[in-house]
Amino acid sequence: MAYTIWSKLYHSTTWVFCGLQLDSEKLAEQTFAMYPLAPGETLQLRDPDGTVMDERRDNSRPHS
């Protein structure tokens, strides 16, 4: 199991796996902090159990 980053785009209701799997929690947190956001996008960092550890949101567009 690995730490993963998930994305939900503006006006979407579906979370999409971003293709990044990291075994180290520290490396996952550092990568997540630097991951670029698209306008209106929401990103989640999830632990190996699928629990959301952190969430970032671009607020340049309203969210639904």
Language-model segments: residues:
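Short aromatic-glycine-(Arg/Gly/Cys) micro-motifs in beta-strand/loop hairpins
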Residues: M1-F17, D47
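Short linear sequence elements within intrinsically disordered, low-complexity coil regions
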Residues: K8, W15, L22, L37-G40
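A short, exposed loop/beta-hairpin motif centered on an aromatic-Gly-Thr core
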Residues: T13-L27, G50
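Acidic, low-complexity, intrinsically disordered interaction modules
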Residues: K26-L27, M34-P36
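Short, mixed-charge low-complexity intrinsically disordered segments
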Residues: P36-S64
